[in-house]
Amino acid sequence: MVLKKFLAVFLSLVIFVMVIAPISAIAKDTCDCDEVPIIYVRGRSPIYLDKDDPNSHEIPVFSEEFIKKAAKELVPVYTKGYLTDDFSEFKTLLTQYMAELCKDYMLDKNGEVPNNSGQKACEYWKNVPLTDIHKTSNDVSTANGAHDELYKYFYQYDSRVDPCETADDLHEYIQAVKKVTGHSRVKLLGRCLGTIILSAYLAEYGWEDVDDVVLYNSICFGTEVNNSLFNGELYFDADGVDYFATQNLGDSLLFTLLKEIITLSNKLNGLDMTMDYFNKTGTRVAKYVIHDVMRACYGTFPAYWAMVSADRFEEARDYIFAGVEDEYAGLIQKINHYYETVGSKLTSMYKQM
């Protein structure tokens, strides 16, 4: 009888502790302010040759020397192909140049990082404890203040790898922010490639930890540039080439001169003639060349595959990996998984917001 009474009391105490302890913990950790912490997931981040070396350089390196050498060899080979209607030499040479340029940057055939390239900042929050800085402490009416406020909880990631794997890491980061701030939910702001990471996260983990989501410069539904490139489609437009050169070429003497020549040529309609020359064979050559080139660079990035819209994904996959499906089985499995669990369900998922 005494034993039964003892067990009854003991079990009652155990149950009491099991019920009260979590409640006490929640009460202790919960912040009662109205400022829900914001986690910022931006777009592409720099990739360094050796993420553990603070003196490492960013890759790939588009040096003047490399571009001059490539142009010197590729232009006559393309012209030869145009005259002979045989672009096999051009395809081989262009693929070799891209492989050389991206040898330390590209992923392997399983879509995994094969070396120590990356960004050390992605691991900071795991090694240095987060602090509670979620309450507004900057003048957000100024550009600098708004910037500092936004970057308080700044999630960084390798912009090449599988978005679904990154989403798992983001989930851990969200839990860490919740714990240190005392809030049960967070706000998520995604920009550019970051909108793909948020989409993968929401598809896997839902809205339980999320108070609100903002998609800025969203590309999670795909981009025309990626749709065309991953399907071997290429068209040269004079205004587009002029704009690209102005925005992306450097400020060295060579590049400055090149930009001025391109802009002047465009104004005099000379660039249109050059583009017409390329477009006469460009469509056919692009389809013949691009799949090999893409497998030597950006085509190995699962995250970049996520920028292909759902309605063009299967066509792109079958084009890029035609004849080498077994060789790239690991990578194909990753991009198929994203398409099946995230990409093909984006419209219905966001309609439920």
Where do the PLM segments sit?
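Sec-dependent signal peptide cleavage junction
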Residues: 19-32
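N-terminal non-catalytic accessory region
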Residues: 29-189, 195-245
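Helical cap/lid subdomain of alpha/beta-hydrolase-fold lipid enzymes
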Residues: 43-103, 108-109, 218-353
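Hydrophobic core
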Residues: 11-19
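Bacterial N-terminal signal peptides that target proteins for export
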Residues: 1-10
